[in-house]
Amino acid sequence: HLCDRRQRQMCIRDSIYILLFSYLEHRPVHSYHIVHTVFDDWIPFCEFFIVPYMLWFPYMILAVIYFIFFNKNKHEYYQLAFNLMMGMTVFLIVSYVYPNAQHIRPTEFPRDNIFTDIVKWLYSTDTPTNILPSIHVFNSLAIHMSLTNCETLRNKKFIKAASFTLTALIIMSTMFLKQHSVIDVCMGATLALFGFLVFYPRRVSVSSESVCFREVKRKKSEN
């Protein structure tokens, strides 16, 4: 059965990724390369961004569930699956050969509320290591790409707008919560762009043809 096969494939990939990531998090490392830019110091800490940051998890899960159980287009499922697998693989390789970390998390919080309490919990469970490129950024963009390129969702403007808004807020949250440096975000976005060019080439070629067609039409009208 197609759904069963997709489930098995996703479970196997996720299990391998979790095991390898756990190894990278706990392996002995003599020194980490510190990731930091001056832009990180300009971005203020804002605990309210914990909301979109945590929404990343249901956003990912619900999108994957949709492509496994509800979307009948096998090609679109594999576009998303291979894109996510590519990003995770690059992330694991980078983390292995280039151990990295950041020191931009605040030691004191400007306010005391439920949002800062959740951030404190996040800091206690998520180490500031292996952050380059940002998987939060890459996966959010990969999910957004899959939804906007889904044939059955082509006319669902609300879903596309909601996905775009949430993706933008998730990316911003990684910086405002001091979970990632600007470099991590840029590298995650670059990796997502690479994935788009590789796994959605038809969309790229169609866009290029549209631009060329408009240019030819404009020149004809001028003549």
Per-range role (PLM):
Residues K120-E209:
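Membrane-embedded catalytic cores of phosphoryl/pyrophosphoryl-handling enzymes
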Residues H1-I12:
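Single conserved hydrophobic/aromatic residue that forms the stacking wall/gate
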Residues D41-I61:
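Interfacial helix-start motif at the membrane-water boundary
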Residues L24-V38, F70-L153, S207-V211, E215:
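Membrane-interface loops
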Residues I18-Y23, M88-V94, T165-M175:
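Aromatic-anchored segments of alpha-helical transmembrane domains
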Residues V51-M54, P58, Q79-N83, P133, ...:
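Alpha-helical transmembrane segments of integral membrane proteins
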Residues P58-H75:
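Internal transmembrane alpha-helix with an interfacial aromatic "cap," most often the third helix
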Residues R5, V206-N223:
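Membrane-interfacial, low-structure loops and terminal tails that flank and connect transmembrane helices
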